[in-house]
Swiss-Prot record:
Protein task: Receptor for netrin required for axon guidance. Mediates axon repulsion of neuronal growth cones in the developing nervous system upon ligand binding. NTN1/Netrin-1 binding might cause dissociation of UNC5C from polymerized TUBB3 in microtubules and thereby lead to increased microtubule dynamics and axon repulsion. Axon repulsion in growth cones may also be caused by its association with DCC that may trigger signaling for repulsion. Might also collaborate with DSCAM in NTN1-mediated axon repulsion independently of DCC. Also involved in corticospinal tract axon guidance independently of DCC.
Location of this chain's protein in the cell: Cell membrane; Cell surface; Synapse, Synaptosome; Cell projection, Dendrite
The name this protein goes by in its record: Netrin receptor UNC5C
Keywords: Apoptosis, Cell membrane, Cell projection, Developmental protein, Disulfide bond, Glycoprotein, Immunoglobulin domain, Membrane, Phosphoprotein, Receptor, Repeat, Signal, Synapse, Synaptosome, Transmembrane, Transmembrane helix
Record note on quaternary structure: Interacts with DCC (via cytoplasmic domain). Interacts (tyrosine phosphorylated form) with PTPN11. Interacts (via extracellular domain) with FLRT3 (via extracellular domain). Interacts (via Ig-like C2-type domain) with DSCAM (via extracellular domain). Interacts (via death domain) with DAPK1. Interacts (via cytoplasmic domain) with TUBB3; this interaction is decreased by NTN1/Netrin-1.
Gene name, Swiss-Prot/TrEMBL: Unc5c
Main location: membrane
Length: 931
């Protein structure tokens, strides 16, 4: 018998151990089942099984071809779990750490023709009752265990849950009435359910597909946003939640898009309705541009306007009385006259009819007429002949003179041509007329150019050049540039630079200024203290301009994978780079460019600027402006008026603003005071000479915007001038009350010093300070010491706004004749790092950041998601901006990184996550040793 089994096993290619397993295991299982049938005994039975048999050939561990998958029980329908493994001598299910009875398994066995290994497939059925009977915090789960001669293998756990969907929505959309082109937000939080319900929106029972109509957007937390409401968007909107159990519809929210009426243009004034005397004229307009729709407001104002008019009445002319008859003349007649002036005709009145003069015979026809004398006839004939001859001579002389003058004119033209050497006038038409310049005066030793002063690196796009090779630039031409104050500044370097440019090069530079002058070469040519640049890839990094309060955060993933950008950020200090200001507007930040412009970004970068606004009041209208390629300043967004279409988001902190943008450009923050209570912060800094060998001593009081870059510029300027800081700078709240800033000096020792100021104080006009467009604004107090032996200066300086706040400086300084080292402690010499790349630029480690994004991006029923994170970090002013991003949590963490750079307050972030119940992330932060 034993030999027969071995022979059969040998013919089938099977080991003896396998045959024993095939025979023994089922028998043992049947005995166990027929015994007690309990799961505990089954468990002991399987523990007593040997792992391998001595006669088994080497065999791999079981490999699962099919693992059990998660299942949901709908109503009372049981679910089946499937499992398939190879090679497997036995395969069983274990549910909730207990073995499933063998009789509950449906087993299918076959031999793989390719490998010759046994493939076993098993399935079990799970009922609703089994799932409901489970008590404990964990859901019902099952796991598949397979045996082979090499050992056992366990599959993954498959959870079985009872599917359901509540009937009541946690938040239903509400109807709204909105104006045309306004943003609409319809909120929806679906009912609780397992599995989590999918959400779709219906517009009049039609499914909304944002891919087809881009005016719709469905956020990650299921809210519907209509970007710009159209008339066609007037409809009934329904939120639909569905899973495998049921489908629920919310109450219908009716959105009505109304149009407020607008007036048409006024018609022309009608003619005066009165033909004579006082009347009126009128003009009309209609409320049809557009006409009010869907309950929109009717136009406010009058549809008819009337003005008084006066039409002058026509006056017909009338004759005056006849004058007296004249005396009787030689011809025996006398006359009389009258005039049409009683009244004269006017305003279209009729003229007088009849004769002005009237004559009649004054002798009743008895006057005698004498015959003409023959001598008189001869005299008359002679006079006529003489006049005729004179006229003929005059005509001949005039003709002669005319012809002579005409020949002289032609001769002049010929001579002029000869002077030109035979060349005909040439009409030069350049490609751009605005690039033609007046040829320089070659006889002059110096050319005088009146206009704005440009820095050396801006010459290529500011100095007009000519394309004509005849007008080559003069070598060593001295150009004197007159600025607005009338001072003359030699610009030898400017002339030398322009003389080295060929006309072709100049034209090429001008044609490509929009692309080339904004890139990395511009950043490298500017003042190094105002610029930071570096090379970045998809890992991101940080650009910092030291001591300026200006930085650019490039988050990881902002630059597309595989691309490398050379990026820069620079502060513009020239006044012509600043945006124009209206009366009530003021510049709150420095003008900053970041680039390269036009670079493709996949997520927002964060530009951080220091501002000087006092955000504690609500009397500001703060807006972000950017400069287009053509140099025009455009409005980007008004803080507090963001909508779905605004390209940027601004986080305004107490002293800094953070601009989230995907468009690298030139930006500035502009404030407009809505009331006189609006205030901006000024920084008052007092400087004096480092050494003074004369009797005069000058004190300079600077009134600057309270930004780091403004103070840095003055510190650098004073360092070049040999100045020193006499007192710690102080802040002053300057209100938009139109009152000037008054500066005065007090408590001078008159026995040692005297002030050369004639008045009691100096004033800086309000608008010079408020506009923020004037750099390095200051006043100078000149004191004269009575003796060179006087080396101590003690006085007080008072700076205050009329009817406003003020500051007092107590000066106590030593006047030295010997120069000493310049000490400007406000410039941190250690702040020399301008570029940080890769993970070292960020406080949050990348794995923890990814874990946070994956767990907080998905909306949670209790709200413990990215919205709560934004609320806890005080970044929830406009959540819709984050909702439109693929990872709202990632953008919020980027903004947190920019706010807390460079220290990174991870302890505060950990406390926030602890409050949100994210204990695992806090543990990870602690494990990384980050706080």
């Amino acid at each position: 018998m034993r030999k027969g089994l071995r022979a059969t096993a040998a013919r089938c290619g099977l080991g003896l151990g396998y045959l024993l397993q095939m025979l023994v295991l089922p028998a043992l299982a049947l005995l166990s089942a027929s015994g007690t049938g309990s799961a505990a005994q089954d468990d002991e039975f399987f523990h007593e099984l040997p792992e391998t048999f001595p006669s088994d050939p080497p065999e791999p561990l079981p490999h699962f071809l099919i693992e059990p998958e998660e299942a949901y029980i709908v109503k009372n329908k049981p679910v089946n779990l499937y499992c398939k493994a190879s090679p497997a001598t036995q395969i069983y299910f274990k549910c909730n750490s207990e073995w499933v009875h063998q009789k509950d398994h449906v087993v299918d066995e076959r031999v793989d023709e390719t490998s010759g290994l046994i493939v076993r497939e098993v399935s079990i059925e799970i009922s609703r009752q089994q799932v409901e009977e489970l008590f404990g915090p964990e859901d019902y789960w099952c796991q598949c265990v397979a045996w082979s001669s090499a050992g056992t293998t366990k599959s993954r756990k498959a959870y079985v849950r009872i599917a359901y969907l509540r009937k009541t929505f946690e938040q239903e959309p509400l109807g709204k009435e909105v104006s045309l082109e306004q943003e609409v937000l319809l909120q929806c939080r679906p009912p609780e359910g397992i599995p989590v319900a999918e959400v779709e929106w219906l517009k009049n029972e039609d499914i909304i597909d944002p891919a087809e109509d881009r005016n719709f957007y469905i956020t990650i937390d299921h809210n519907l946003i209509i970007k710009q409401a159209r008339l066609s968007d007037t409809a009934n909107y329904t939120c639909v939640a569905k899973n495998i159990v049921a489908k629920r519809k919310s109450t219908t929210a009716t959105v009505i898009v109304y149009v407020n009426g607008g007036w048409s243009t006024w018609t022309e004034w009608s003619v005066c309705n009165s033909r004579c005397g006082r009347g009126y004229q009128k003009r009309t307009r209609t409320c049809t541009n557009p006409a009010p729709l869907n309950g929109g407001a009717f136009c406010e104002g009058q549809s008819v306007q009337k003005i008084a008019c006066t039409t002058l009445c026509p006056v017909d002319g009338r004759w005056t009385s006849w004058s007296k008859w004249s005396t009787c003349g030689t011809e025996c007649t006398h006359w009389r006259r009258r005039e049409c002036t009683a009244p004269a005709p006017k305003n279209g009145g009729k003229d007088c009819d009849g004769l002005v003069l009237q004559s009649k015979n004054c002798t009743d026809g008895l006057c005698m007429q004498a015959a003409p004398d023959s001598d008189d006839v001869a005299l008359y004939v002679g006079i006529v002949i003489a006049v005729t001859v004179c006229l003929a001579i005059t005509v001949v002389v005039a003709l002669f003179v005319y012809r002579k003058n005409h020949r002289d004119f032609e001769s002049d033209i010929i001579d002029s041509s000869a002077l030109n050497g035979g060349f005909q006038p040439v009409n030069i038409k350049a490609a751009r007329q605005d690039l033609l310049a007046v040829p320089p005066d070659l006889t002059s030793a110096a050319a005088m150019y009146r206009g704005p002063v440009y820095a050396l690196h801006d010459v290529s796009d500011k100095i007009p050049m000519t394309n004509s090779p005849i007008l080559d630039p003069l070598p060593n031409l001295k150009i004197k540039v007159y600025n607005s104050s009338g001072a003359v500044t030699p610009q030898d370097d400017l002339a030398e630079f322009s003389s080295k440019l060929s006309p072709q090069m100049t034209q090429s530079l001008l044609e490509n200024e929009a692309l080339n002058l904004k890139n990395q070469s511009l950043a490298r040519q500017t003042d190094p203290s105002c610029t930071a640049f570096g090379t970045f890839n998809s890992l991101g990094g940080h650009l910092i301009i030291p001591n300026s309060g200006v930085s650019l955060l490039i988050p990881a993933g902002a630059i597309p994978q595989g691309r490398v950008y050379e990026m820069y950020v620079t502060v513009h200090r020239k006044e012509n780079m600043r945006p124009p200001m209206e009366d009530s507007q003021t510049l709150l930040t420095p003008v900053v460019s970041c680039g390269p412009p036009g670079a493709l970004l996949t997520r927002p970068v964060i530009l951080t600027l220091h501002h000087c606004a006092d955000p504690s009041t609500e009397d500001w209208k703060i807006q972000l402006k950017n400069q287009a390629v053509q140099g025009q300043w455009e409005d980007v967004v008004v803080v507090g008026e963001e909508n779905f279409t605004t390209p940027c988001y601004i986080q305004l902190d107490a002293e800094a603003c953070h601009i989230l943008t995907e468009n690298l450009s030139t930006y500035a923050l502009v404030g407009q005071s809505t009331t006189k209570a609006a205030a901006k912060r000024l920084k008052l800094a007092i400087f004096g000479p480092l050494c003074c060998s004369s009797l005069e001593y000058s004190i300079r009081v600077y009134c600057l915007d309270d930004t780091q870059d403004a103070l840095k510029e003055v510190l650098q300027l004073e360092r070049q001038m040999g100045g020193q800081l006499l007192e710690e700078p102080k802040a002053l709240h300057f209100k938009g009350s139109i009152h000037n800033l008054r500066l005065s000096i007090h408590d001078i020792a008159h026995s040692l010093w005297k002030s050369k100021l004639l008045a009691k104080y100096q004033e800086i006009p309000f608008y010079h300070i408020w506009s923020g467009s004037q750099r390095n604004l200051h006043c100078t107090f000149t004191l004269e010491r009575l003796s060179l032996n006087t080396v101590e200066l003690v006085c007080k300086l008072c700076v205050r706004q009329v009817e406003g706040e003020g500051q007092i400086f107590q000066l106590n300084c030593t006047v030295s004749e010997e120069p000493t080292g310049i000490d400007l402690p406000l410039l941190d010499p250690a702040s020399t790092i301008t570029t940080v790349t890769g993970p070292s630029a960020f406080s949050i480690p990348l794995p923890i950041r990814q874990k946070l994004c994956s767990s907080l991006d998905a909306p949670q029923t209790r709200g413990h998601d990215w919205r709560m994170l934004a609320h806890k970090l005080n970044l929830d002013r406009y959540l819709n901006y984050f909702a439109t991003k693929s990872s709202p949590t990632g953008v919020i963490l980027d903004l947190w990184e920019a706010q807390n750079f460079p220290d990174g307050n991870l302890s505060m972030l950990a406390a926030v996550l602890e409050e949100m119940g994210r204990h695992e992330t806090v543990v990870s932060l602690a494990a990384e040793g980050q706080y």
